[in-house]
Amino acid sequence: MQIDFYHWGGMCPLADEFINLVHLSTPTLTVESHDLTTNFALAREKKVFFPFLTVVDHIHRYYAPITGSFMEKLKQGILPVERPYCPKLGQTVYIATIEPITRDNYALAKQCTGRKSCGGCNTKLRMYDAVGERILGFVHREGNRLLGGAEFYPSMFVPYDIPHKEDTAFITCVYGSDETFDYKSAPLEALEGYLSETYRYALVVADEESVFPNGDLPFFLRHGYRDKGILLTDDYCRLHLLAKNL
């Protein structure tokens, strides 16, 4: 089997972990990793709109984080079955403490990875340093507990096949809700307010039903984003590009 792992640098702080995992392979697997940070052409060719993508034998696309059990199945010649992550989302907006995400408090924001230690977090911070951004987004916390967050990157440096303009920001990640409460509306609105000081527009890629990479689609429509059309359709997702005037 041929395994190709595509990733946008360290935009997902777990990318380094996944790269190490895919390269711990047996002779039955041929593994290559591809950093898309400056390779916009490859991202467009492979239709990558997630911070990482695993492709098996040049055909089978997998979007979820790589796990040991996933790799074990591939080593046995078994194609894993992947299902979209579509949790029930509460729509009651909850607001605790909202603050900018910076290098100083990123230890809180990285709780979204579900890891106690995150070796790739410094890689992500360096990506923002490289484009002169001190603020990554906004975090929603209650004490030292992460509730949600919203992050962005200048669209000019996003490798996905989207419009790249200096007056446009790209919403990279919006996270945090449960069945009862919506924890991500408040940080998203704070982020939009901050972005409006520099940018005229915000773009985001969202799935119709899943919350990965962002979503679901109705969430952004409720927040005033306009549906600009479908970017990708397959058995896992139906991704839309959305835009909003800031």
Regions found by a protein language model. Give the residues of each.
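Local sequence-structure signature of Cys/Sec-based thiol-disulfide redox active-site neighborhoods
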Residues: 1-26
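Conserved catalytic-core motifs of GNAT/GCN5-like acyltransferases
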Residues: 60-62, 224-240
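Conserved active-site alpha-helix within GNAT-family acetyltransferase domains
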Residues: 209-229
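A short, internal acetyl-CoA/4′-phosphopantetheine-binding micro-motif in the GNAT/acyltransferase core
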Residues: 172-183, 208-209
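Conserved acetyl-CoA-binding loop-helix of GNAT-fold acetyltransferases
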Residues: 180-197
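A conserved beta-strand-loop-helix scaffold within acyl/acetyltransferase catalytic domains
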Residues: 120-168
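Non-catalytic, surface beta->alpha helical segment in thiol-disulfide oxidoreductase systems
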Residues: 57-85
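Conserved GNAT acetyl-CoA-binding A-motif
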Residues: 195-211
